[in-house]
């Protein structure tokens, strides 16, 4: 099978390109500029006005390109996110349709359902996006759904929670570096669990989602990587070889303090529950994640401190 990948130079995209090539697929990486590392695993085309021509011969496309953070350009955050996560998604879908690509997998975000939930999130859970990024991802889903309703091609929407793995960007490595300094942290009482997904498992699911037997539908994806902030800090301290020095502060008080310094959303994402129910992915596609959560997190944290690869002694998280 020939698989095209947008966002191929991003964190997930690189892993997807490599995994697809290693499984014997022909891979077309759509990039803004040529990349020497990707050249080992894929043919490359620079995205331009000839996108339909570049996609000729592809059986499926995984659309990962988008905008997660705004660099100030004088435009509103909402407009920048909409251009990247809605309008560009439609451009790719139109090019794929013109090129005869049969299947498109759109990587959205669990954030379309909000940033907290007392019940596990499923595909039919209410929409409640609360950031410009999440709003734009939902707009992308809705626009692509309308577009594909008029075409014979199939659309698969994938909603992952926060993605982690060796070398991952974002809050996880920042928190790990803070823990490694051995400073006292006020997170011992933060026991609400949130779902994550290991990048290797997400990539495995995406390769399943673009197979010919998959009908167009939506999937919440996870792998059992459910951790509280207190559990993460304990794991990180073990991986860094330092003593965990947490003390309890009520989560509500942490959120109040965060609001005072304009970090309300960040603290919400650390202290409130947000679990996903990915049973539909298991039952509909017969999919099982190849990497176990405790092993995946241990691998991720060990990569932060390669000189301390002593393993993580305590197994935290589901079986």
Where are these regions (language model features)?
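Active-site Tyr-X1-5-Lys
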Residues: 130-156
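N-terminal Rossmann NAD(P)H-binding glycine-rich loop of SDR-like oxidoreductase domains
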Residues: 3-23
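Glycine-rich Rossmann NAD(P)(H)-binding loop
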Residues: 6, 165, 187-192, 219-227, ...
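Mid/C-terminal beta-alpha module of Rossmann-like enzyme folds, strongest
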Residues: 208-266, 294, 298-301, 308-319
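Glycine/proline-rich active-site loop of Rossmann-fold NAD(P)-dependent oxidoreductases
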Residues: 138, 151-153, 164-174, 209-219, ...
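A conserved pocket-lining segment of Rossmann-fold NAD(P)-dependent short-chain dehydrogenase/reductase
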Residues: 73, 177-197, 201, 205-209, ...
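Conserved Rossmann-fold NAD(P)-dependent oxidoreductase catalytic core, especially the SDR/UDP-sugar
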Residues: 90-132
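NAD(P)H-binding glycine-rich loop region in Rossmannoid oxidoreductase-like domains
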Residues: 36, 46-91, 95-98
